[in-house]
From Swiss-Prot:
This is NAD(P)H-quinone oxidoreductase subunit 5, chloroplastic. One of its GO terms (cellular component) is chloroplast thylakoid membrane. It is found in: Plastid, Chloroplast thylakoid membrane. InterPro entries: NADH_UbQ_OxRdtase_chlpt_su5_C (IPR002128), NADHpl_OxRdtase_5_subgr (IPR018393), ND/Mrp_TM (IPR001750), NU5C-like (IPR003945), Proton_antipo_N (IPR001516). NDH is composed of at least 16 different subunits, 5 of which are encoded in the nucleus. Its EC number is 7.1.1.-.
Length: 739
């Protein structure tokens, strides 16, 4: 067993040869490398599969022996300081390694077909390989220095992948926004790391935890300074995991290719912040203020992410805000001290969300056959609907991920979310009520996405998108499907410049050639499709895109079973508890692992009821128009025109504007921080040009005129010398006698 652990250092470096070889090949043998480009995807999958097998082997050994292995190389600089590098193999490392590799393999297989017609195919797989290396290096790090190095590499890779289509202005702005926002958190992380080193004198986790706990126990450290350092470290996790208030980069990150969105949202970048807090939980756990602060940020993010997802029309942005809310659940669990439930939800959510994002990519891929390459149209749920009969496999797998995220048993997310909700009642009643209500909102908005995408008729034809009849306006409100209607030109539903809505109001025709579909985008030109037919309706993608959906669907069905505590009658099947032994769980330190089935069913009824309520309301409002007229009659009979109806409409519009405008947080940041920095830059520019340059230029001009005067005086004429001499003497005497 120990021989297996000794080779743990190789885990991050196995995927690394692919980006190196691609770079060298493009530099030295560009033609041959491009001709063999499909070979690189196979090698990427093969190497990541090797890492997955190795990680599974380590996990099995840990489950059986509850062992932790750490290896350190010391580089002694002097007697007072030594720089150490190594790797740490513990339950958290093995969980994250399996998560990264399994989701990564599915994304790579999916991307082989999804990116097949992209000219930057090789660059994509080079970035993906480096991304996997960076994340695997992060989770195997044994000290804070290595954590920070790989933390920055993960941020750099996310910057490259979000801005993959960098010649598109939106993608370029999105990657810059993600980079700058994460730099704020990373600066706090660096300061926090240096602060903890100043306190303990060590970067190694084991020494750091032991020394710090002893200092806290003996009351030999300033509590305010310790809290500040812990808060700065937590700021790094807040930015990376898109927690309030540094969440603003996440929806814009959808400008990258859809497989990148799946990888970032499931197992890599956003999971890094959760991993950091979980790794440093022995530090945070002895600082009550920080634990309370973590849970507070978590519950705010839970509610904010859910409300912002309510009115999104872009399918990927809706899923992005869903990720933000679910990460808030994980952060809430860590703040409550429920270490096990946080990691459990990290696992279940990763597979469910990867399934949903890859499913959305399949939907987008199929919609492009009708509307052409345009993210405003192919990702717009207003133009979708009725896709069930066109892409049934995608529909069924997407429904599986939808129900899992809603919290419907026995799917994966039900078990983990239910555990977090149960623990929240033991921690804070207010937090528990918010978390429970948000579970209903989650079911509402995620099922809304499903209904708008797959149920009813294909709206791109229904609203005469390529037809002849003029449509005045097509709205998709918060509480129902779109309907054509005339509107007042002075009416403004939201304060944002709604580019998305205007993009599909114009009556245009988007023909598709019979043999060739030319789709041109900046830097990327797609000139050939294998399907040489005219498509007026979407179609199911190739098998290489469907296979990952089916595998992730199986994970969504069965991965929740690893955390179910079936351990009665001497049979212990709670794999996750064995895996995490000894785990940290403040709420259940004195409880046995056996399940109280009465409590389980009581809590299950509560959580499942709110989920079904959200699904029912979404079905009531977003069912196909032809089958929901009676529902609208029922709603109209309940909410008749009058003062109450007017008040209700104002509330609905307020909620819609709040959601669609992202709670006005982006606008606030733009006006306050961005505007303030630009104002300061203008002031600095004015001071530099007018004051600093003015003084410098003024001295030069004065010297010029003085030189000209001296040159005129020194012309060699004695009469001029006498004249100026007598003039200066007269002025001097006059001033002298007056004073």
């Amino acid at each position: 067993m120990q021989q297996t652990y000794q080779y743990g250092w190789i885990i991050p470096f196995i995927p690394l040869p692919i980006p190196i070889l691609i770079g060298v090949g493009l530099l030295l043998f560009p033609t041959a490398t491009k001709n063999l480009r499909r070979m690189w995807s196979f090698q990427s999958v093969l190497l990541l599969t090797i890492v997955m097998i190795f990680s599974i082997n380590l996990s099995i050994q840990q489950i059986n022996s509850n062992s932790i292995y750490q290896y350190v190389w010391s580089w002694i600089i002097n007697n007072d300081f030594s720089l150490e590098f190594g790797y740490l193999i513990d339950p958290l490392t093995s969980i994250m390694s399996i998560l990264i590799t399994t989701v990564g393999i599915m994304v790579l297989i999916y991307s082989d077909n999804y990116m097949a017609h992209d000219q930057a195919y090789l660059r994509f797989f080079a970035y993906m390989g480096f991304f996997s290396t960076s994340m695997l290096g992060l989770v195997t790090s044994s000290n804070l220095i290595q954590i920070y190095i790989f933390w920055e590499l993960v941020g750099m890779c996310s910057y490259l992948l979000i801005g993959f289509w960098f010649t598109r202005p939106l993608a370029a702005n999105a990657c810059q926004k993600a980079f700058v926002t994460n730099r704020i958190g990373d600066f706090g992380l660096l300061l926090g790391i240096l602060g903890f080193y100043w306190i303990t004198g060590s970067f190694e986790f084991r020494d750091l935890f032991e020394i710090f706990n002893n200092l806290i126990y003996d009351n030999e450290v300033n509590s305010l300074f310790v809290t500040l350092c812990a808060g700065l470290v937590f700021a790094g996790a807040v930015a990376k995991s898109a927690q309030f208030p540094l969440h603003v980069w996440l929806p814009d990150a959808m400008e990258g290719p859809t497989p990148i969105s799946a990888l970032i949202h499931a197992a890599t970048m956003v999971a890094a912040g959760i991993f950091l807090v979980a790794r440093l939980i022995p530090l945070f756990i002895v600082i009550p203020y920080i634990m309370n602060f973590i849970s507070l940020i978590g519950i705010i993010t839970v509610l904010l992410g859910a409300t912002l997802a309510l009115a999104q029309k872009d399918i990927k942005r809706g899923l992005a805000f869903s990720t933000m809310s679910q990460l808030g659940y994980m952060m809430l669990a860590l703040g409550m001290g429920s270490y096990r439930s946080a990691l459990f939800h990290l696992i279940t959510h990763a597979y469910s969300k990867a399934l949903l994002f890859l499913g959305s990519g399949s939907v987008i891929h199929s919609m492009e056959t009708i509307v052409g390459y345009s993210p405003y149209k192919s990702q717009n749920m207003v133009l979708m609907g009725g896709l069930t009969k066109h892409i049934p496999i995608t529909k069924n797998t997407f429904l599986l991920g939808t129900l899992s995220l809603c919290g419907i048993p026995p799917l994966a997310c039900f078990w983990s979310k239910d555990e977090i909700l149960n623990d929240s009642w033991l921690y804070s009643t207010i937090f528990a009520i918010i978390a429970w209500a948000t579970a209903g909102l989650t079911a509402f908005y995620i099922f809304r996405i499903y209904l708008l995408t797959f149920e009813g008729h294909l709206s791109v034809h229904f609203q005469n998108y390529i037809g002849k009849e003029k449509v005045f306006f097509y709205s998709i409100s918060l509480w129902g499907r779109g309907a054509s209607k005339k509107i007042n030109n002075n009416f403004s539903l939201s304060t944002m410049n709604n580019i998305e809505s205007s993009s599909f109001l114009k009556k245009k025709t988007y023909p598709i050639a019979e043999n060739v579909r030319n789709v041109t985008r900046p830097f990327i030109t797609i000139t050939h499709f294998e399907n040489k037919k005219f498509y007026s309706y979407p179609y199911e993608p190739d098998n290489t895109m469907l296979f990952p959906l089916l595998i992730l669907g199986l994970f969504t069905l069965f991965v929740g079973s690893i955390g179910i505590p079936f351990n009665q009658e001497g049979v212990d099947l709670b794999i996750l508890s064995k895996w995490l032994t000894p785990s940290i769980n403040l709420l259940h330190q004195k409880l046995s692992n056996s399940m109280d089935w009465y409590e389980f069913w009581k809590d299950t009824v509560s959580s499942v009821s709110i989920a079904y309520l959200g699904i029912f309301i979404a079905s009531l409002l977003y069912k196909p128009p032809y089958s929901s007229l009676q529902n609208f009659d029922l709603i109209n009979s309940i909410l008749k025109r009058g003062p109450k109806r007017i008040l209700w409409d104002k509330i609905i519009n307020g909620v819609y504007n709040w959601s669609y405008n992202r709670a006005y947080i982006d606008s606030f940041y733009t006006r306050s921080f961005t505007g303030g920095i630009r104002g300061l830059a203008k002031l600095t520019h004015f001071f530099d040009r007018r004051i600093v340059d003015g003084i410098t230029n003024g001295v030069g001009v004065i010297n010029f005129f003085i030189g000209e005067a001296i040159k005129y005086i020194g012309g060699g004429r004695i009469s001029s010398y006498l004249f100026f001499y007598l003039t200066y003497v007269s002025i001097f005497l006059l001033v002298f006698f007056i004073i």
